[in-house]
Regions:
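S-adenosyl-L-methionine-dependent methyltransferase catalytic core, i.e., the SAM/SAH-binding region
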Residues: 1-305
Length: 305
């Protein structure tokens, strides 16, 4: 499951708020090279871990925008809003579309995909089976569909397809899990679902809990994660100034595959390309010695022609 960046402790955070180190922070800073006076767009600002570091370099708060669809995250960024940063409480595609319509362009753009550590660590958000909570998994509580809705309404075939496609689960295991879910419905809790999956397929030789892939699939479906990435990518060149840099941190192969394909298309487009891709291979999260939770992360970046 993907783990996003999080900041050094801010006076705006409650003492009970989980504190985390931003993923690949030094690498993103070195590749995207923010300098004083540049404008910054963070499409997944979270609790401001990357944003604060980038804004410290640019010192251009008035022309910078931070986006997140999680209300809790937006609330913790109030100190940056007081300095002039624009906060947008929307998903990154809706925000990007609005900014394109406004004719806004930026020198540096960052998107750090996936679920954040505070989301995982709050039982009531329902992202993790480490805590017993409702099967929610919504990054934006304003949306209607929850993981419980999917678990308790999808057919065996639809659940099998979902777990196979988005969870990258073996087809046979996915079908057994789907059949067990339908038979056991209604299912409302995270540990209830995780225990059911473990009882159904066992742990075997797997490094991770046998429910990990199913939980990933449900989260992706609830939040339309891959569809939003596909919609975002072609908007990025329209949001960059000439010479502007965009970086994207992904956490699993489904995300990285979409980004790699788009960047490869740009690299092969010749004079029609809108972006230059300096490095074909992504930077791996294993290079981030400061944050062991980032080991599954990959970072790709491009420059506007």
């Amino acid at each position: 499951m993907s783990i996003k960046e999080h900041p050094p402790q801010s006076e705006k955070l409650q003492e009970s708020e989980p504190i985390h180190v931003p993923v690949l922070l030094e690498i993103t800073l070195s590749k995207l090279r923010p300098v004083e006076g540049e404008s910054y767009l963070d499409l997944t600002a979270g609790y401001g871990g990357h944003a604060r570091a980038f804004l410290n370099r640019t010192d251009n708060y008035l022309n910078s925008v931070l986006v997140d669809r999680d209300e809790n995250a937006i609330k913790t960024l109030g100190d940056l809003a007081e300095k002039g940063v624009t906060l947008i409480h929307k998903d990154f595609v809706s925000a990007a579309q609005d900014l394109v319509k406004q004719g806004r362009k930026f020198d540096v753009i960052l998107a750090d995909l996936g679920v954040s550590s505070p989301q995982l660590d709050r039982a009531e958000r329902g992202f993790s089976f480490r805590f017993d909570g409702p099967l929610d998994m919504r990054m934006d509580n304003r949306t209607e569909i929850t993981a419980a809705d999917i678990v308790n309404s999808y057919s065996v075939d639809d659940l099998t397809r979902l777990i196979t496609l988005y969870g990258e689960e073996n087809l046979g295991r996915a079908r057994r899990i789907a059949q067990a879910i339908v038979k056991a419905r209604p299912i409302q809790g995270t540990t209830e679902l995780a225990d059911l999956i473990k009882q159904t397929v066992g742990r075997g030789s797997m490094k991770h809990h046998p429910a990990t892939r199913t939980f990933q699939a449900l989260r992706i479906e609830v939040n339309r994660e891959l569809k939003l990435i596909e919609e975002l990518l072609p908007l990025l060149p329209r949001l960059l100034n000439k010479g502007g840099r965009v970086g994207i941190i992904s956490f699993h192969s489904l995300e990285d595959r979409l980004i790699k394909r788009y960047f490869s298309e740009q690299a092969m487009a010749g004079y029609e390309a809108e972006l230059i891709v300096p490095e074909k291979k992504p930077v791996s999260g294993t290079e981030d010695v400061h944050n062991p939770r980032s080991r599954s992360a990959k970072f790709r970046y491009a420059v506007k022609k």
